[in-house]
């Protein structure tokens, strides 16, 4: 359970996990931008599956930081 409060933006209520999702999405774009020039995607069998797993790992790390 997150200790962050519920965010209200322009009258819309967002759960505390929304901030964690946005942070992990930003980290995902940075890490993917770093990995693409290295050529690691040539060794990956399914790039979309790799990206999904990478995002899940980053989301897990982000949620562990906030809990």
From Swiss-Prot:
Gene Ontology CC: one annotated term: plasma membrane
Superkingdom of the source species: Bacteria
One family name in Pfam for this protein: DUF1656
Lineage: Bacteria, Pseudomonadati, Pseudomonadota, Gammaproteobacteria, Enterobacterales
Family: Belongs to the AaeX family.
Keyword Kinase carried by entry: no
NCBIfam families named among the record's database cross-references: PRK11594.1
Protein name: Protein AaeX
Subcellular location as annotated: Cell membrane
Keywords, in A-Z order: Cell membrane, Membrane, Transmembrane, Transmembrane helix
HAMAP family linked: AaeX
Record-annotated membrane-spanning stretches: 3-23, 39-59
Membrane topology: Multi-pass membrane protein
InterPro entries: DUF1656
């Amino acid at each position: 359970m997150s200790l962050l409060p519920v965010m209200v933006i322009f009258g819309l209520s967002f759960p505390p996990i929304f901030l964690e999702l946005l942070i992990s999405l930003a980290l995902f774009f940075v890490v993917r931008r770093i990995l693409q020039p290295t050529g690691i995607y040539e060794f990956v069998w399914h790039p979309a599956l790799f990206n999904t797993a990478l995002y899940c790992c980053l989301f897990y790390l982000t949620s562990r930081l906030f809990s």
